Amino acid sequence: MTTHYIAGNWQAGQGETLQSLNPVTQAVIWQGQGADASQVDTAVQAARQAFPAWAQLSLEARIDVLEKFAAQLKVHAEAMAQCIGEETGKPLWESATEVTSMINKVAISVQSYRERTGEKSGPLADATAVLRHKPHGVVAVFGPYNFPGHLPNGHIVPALLAGNCVVFKPSELTPKVAELTVNCWIAAGLPAGVLNLVQGARETGVALAANPGIDGLFFTGSSRTGNLLHQQFAGRPDKILALEMGGNNPLVVDEVKDLDAAVYTIVQSAFISAGQRCTCARRLLVPQGAWGDALIARLVEVCKTITVGAFDEQPAPFMGSVISLQAARALLAAQVELAAKGGVKLLEMTQPQADAALLTPGIVDVTAVADRPDEEFFGPLLQVIRYGDFDAAIDEANNTQYGLAAGLLSDSRARYQYFWLRSRAGIVNWNKQLTGAASSAPFGGVGASGNHRASAYYAADYCAYPVASLETASLALPATLTPGVTL
């Protein structure tokens, strides 16, 4: 089966056998062999050969290809949404919004490039100061499974726009979405070698990250893998490394007037995408006392009614499945571990079908757990922590190695300003779900959550590097020579 797109040609893999399964039915929806190290190297060489011509194209010519790609996505939007839903398990309504985000990424990236990079100049007494930006060359893009179209797209589009060539390794759990995306690029007229697709799991990823022919690597995914990449790139300052990773995100709740609005925002923060967004709330900080008790009781009551089902089920469920049976089992095991440490299951997460990766929402009160794990439980598992005063809540919110997203639900602007100033996170929201983000804003965090602001408006910053120049059209002696020099 032809699973890799290298130098403008589809070819079969020579590495390990791979399968992609529908996470609910376990039906095989894609199969092939991963790329081995030699195929990865061929892909890198193809990108290197294509780089000079692609980089020398005018910006408008590259924009034209990107806009044709967006047009192809529109043509194939329904098929793309179906593919995303089938492979990830997310409901069709959510898959459709992902395709829309992919389409919109082109215009956002063009605007970002013009405003944050591009070319600027200013006159000096005897020359012109010019600032231009140059592409790095060949970059690797590693994509995640939770948004297999949108998140890799957030690296690939700005990278190509800046003049780079790309070797793309998607998650081994979502190869079909990657294949369909690359076909849209081919139909858009992208020249051979500018974008190369290598499918595979760990073996392929290690080979690509270690290949000396890449000039950088752009990664969105787990902190564990990102940390390994960071260690691997240590001592390689000549390589650009952009990491967007996960978070153990806190959502602090103040005593607000509208209890149901708070509950709805918590649900949208913790359980949308079956909890498989890197900005999902993992820790819910609730005040001690009667009001907090009422909030938790209402939250549990509402979460019991959340519908969970297959991606194409009608009427549409709020939550689809998690990515795989393995992921579902790991989350159930995490719930057991929290309970063993002293956590109280306020709402037990369950697996309605043993052979399907469907999970119901789980809520565990871990206030009494002394050694709470600072981990990202990537699914519908929410930990509740009760707090006595606002400063204690902020301290607990910051009690993590991560720093991706944090939020406050409060009727007080002064409290929010106090919270914002003390929060250690790259995204801080007020009375909005943690999973909400504007495409025109930077997306990313601090600490173990990453470095650059990947996959958003600020992606232009790491897709090209600035070059400062002093320029004049003719060479001439200055009117006054430097002391000590005679001509």
Swiss-Prot record:
Q: Which domain of life is it from?
A: Bacteria
The record ties this protein, via NCBIfam families, to: arg_catab_astD, PRK09457.1
A Pfam family annotated for this UniProt entry: Aldedh
Residues where NAD(+) binds: G221, S222, S223, R224, T225, G226
Q: What is this protein called?
A: N-succinylglutamate 5-semialdehyde dehydrogenase
Q: Which Enzyme Commission number(s) are listed?
A: 1.2.1.71
Q: In which pathway does it act?
A: Amino-acid degradation; L-arginine degradation via AST pathway; L-glutamate and succinate from L-arginine: step 4/5
Q: Name one GO molecular function term.
A: succinylglutamate-semialdehyde dehydrogenase activity
Keyword terms: Arginine metabolism, NAD, Oxidoreductase
Organism the protein comes from: Pseudomonas putida (strain ATCC 700007 / DSM 6899 / JCM 31910 / BCRC 17059 / LMG 24140 / F1)
